[in-house]
């Protein structure tokens, strides 16, 4: 008589995964049944996380009430948020949820390699390109020398001893094998990819009834690049940094060399998919792949990220560069990965070529490094801390040589957008500077959930900067991170 085949284990659905993450107690995991001849053992049922679910519902309702309306009032939303946070805290006490971050095994730092000497010729090439760009325009020889300098510096710091960093991994199965083994994951990932791609490219052909001057300048700048005007900065634009215009010109060249408003949105929509992919990788690095898939799906259909790719006002490449830079920074610190830190520094330098908002990125890196050093239990990490700072400064400066040269040629024009907002350069300050600072700080704290303080071009006036779903999850997620941090210190 042939032996009876055991029943195949049931695959986990996304709904079951969410319920499991919310209901499992910290440290508990599901114990698979032994599959004895008597059938599968009964699995212990987990109580539904009613308190956490109630917090989610109240937070969604609170944020919905902050949508633009004639009688919008924040009082009721604040009350609902207070109740939501109370339920969230109660759910945490009942162990309905816990933020269990993944903890990879660090391999040990090795900042300097056998090819470190390449840094010297790399700095030499970067310095030479600085003087070759003295006319304020990119030329083919100058671009080649600058690129060579960046490549040599990266190669000089790149860790080639992969055996010391990467454990041997088994060969990845073919797509068919992976589909047979984990079809729920493959189907879910494919569905998310299709939905995100649809939201990214849907209705790109629509044009606003009236273009503003910033959008028109953006259009003509890309057109000028295609006709040979390869400037280091484009001062007439809302954002003068050049990288986004060159990206749009590159896409236009691939499309036949004709510029249109639809083509500009398409170029930045394609770049936006990179940001969505790295949202998945970042969340997967911190938690797991299912959480990463959920995060990518929410980010890919969210109002604010899509708006950045369609407004054509200078932020089209900001998120596609910023998110990978943060990912590689955190991954490098968690895994002692020098190469990840290098990539983050490279992206930070490219970010300075993209938008002035990246001028704050060095401060973000410093804060992250200080927190990492504070929680480190090894005295040797102090030397690593200063080595990473030096690495960021070197790679970032070499990568940002074109914008540094543009700054030295015309510092007033580069600083004008910044100084006009923090001083009386263009108009007198309407009040006490300290009072204005705190008023602006309070307004900035309310951008996500109360009012974006923007025009119709880059948002819906008097509406929160993000959609109601993102706004509610932002508040709950922020509280969860703070609570989990307090538990871990």
Model regions and ranges:
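Start-transfer (signal-anchor) and selected internal transmembrane alpha helices
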Residues: 6-13, 42-56, 80-199, 374, ...
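Short helix- or helix-capping micro-motifs
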Residues: 196, 295-300, 348, 352
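Transmembrane-lumen/periplasm boundary regions of multi-pass, lipid-linked membrane glycan transferases
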Residues: 199, 204-232, 240-242, 246, ...
């Amino acid at each position: 008589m042939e032996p009876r085949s055991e029943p195949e284990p049931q695959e986990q659905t996304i709904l079951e995964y969410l319920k499991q993450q919310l209901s499992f107690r910290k440290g508990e995991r599901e114990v698979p049944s032994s599959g004895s001849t008597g059938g599968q053992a009964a699995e212990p049922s987990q109580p539904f996380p009613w308190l956490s679910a109630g917090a989610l519902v109240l937070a969604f309702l609170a944020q919905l009430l902050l949508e633009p309306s004639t009688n919008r009032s924040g009082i009721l939303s604040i009350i609902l948020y207070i109740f939501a946070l109370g339920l969230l805290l109660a759910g945490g006490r009942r162990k309905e949820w816990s933020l269990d971050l993944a903890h990879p095994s660090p391999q040990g730092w090795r900042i300097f390699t056998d090819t470190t000497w390449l840094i010297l010729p790399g700095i030499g090439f970067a310095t030479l390109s600085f003087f070759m760009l003295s006319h304020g325009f990119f030329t083919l020889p100058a671009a080649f020398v600058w690129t060579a300098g960046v490549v040599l510096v990266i190669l000089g710091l790149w860790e080639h001893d992969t055996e010391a960093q990467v454990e041997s991994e088994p060969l990845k199965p073919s797509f068919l094998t992976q589909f047979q083994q984990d079809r729920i994951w493959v189907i879910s990932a494919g569905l998310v990819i299709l939905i995100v791609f649809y939201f990214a490219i849907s209705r790109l052909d629509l044009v606003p009834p009236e273009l503003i001057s910033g959008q028109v300048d953006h259009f003509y700048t890309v057109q000028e690049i295609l006709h040979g005007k390869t400037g280091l900065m484009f001062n007439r634009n809302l954002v003068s940094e050049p990288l986004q215009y060159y990206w749009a010109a590159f896409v236009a060249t691939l499309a036949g060399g004709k510029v249109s408003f639809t083509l500009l949105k398409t170029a930045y929509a394609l770049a936006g998919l990179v940001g969505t992919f790295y949202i998945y990788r970042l969340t997967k690095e911190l938690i797991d792949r299912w959480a990463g898939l959920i995060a990518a799906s929410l980010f890919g259909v969210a109002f604010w990220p899509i708006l950045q790719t369609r407004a054509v006002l200078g932020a089209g490449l900001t998120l596609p560069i910023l998110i990978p830079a943060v990912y590689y920074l955190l991954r490098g610190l968690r895994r002692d990965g020098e190469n990840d830190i290098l990539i983050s520094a490279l992206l930070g330098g490219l970010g300075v070529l993209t938008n002035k908002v990246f001028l704050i990125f060095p401060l973000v890196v410093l804060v992250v490094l200080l927190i990492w050093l504070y929680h480190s239990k090894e005295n040797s990490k102090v030397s690593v801390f200063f080595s990473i700072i030096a690495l960021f400064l070197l790679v970032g400066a070499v990568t940002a040589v074109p914008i540094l040269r543009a700054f030295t040629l015309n510092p007033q024009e580069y600083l004008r957008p910044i100084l006009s907002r923090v001083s009386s350069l263009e108009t007198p300050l309407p009040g006490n500077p300290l009072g204005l600072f705190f008023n602006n700080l309070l307004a900035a704290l309310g951008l996500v959930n109360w009012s974006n303080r923007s025009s119709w071009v880059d948002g819906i006036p008097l509406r929160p900067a993000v959609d109601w779903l993102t706004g509610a999850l932002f508040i709950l997620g922020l509280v969860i991170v703070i609570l989990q941090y307090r538990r871990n210190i």
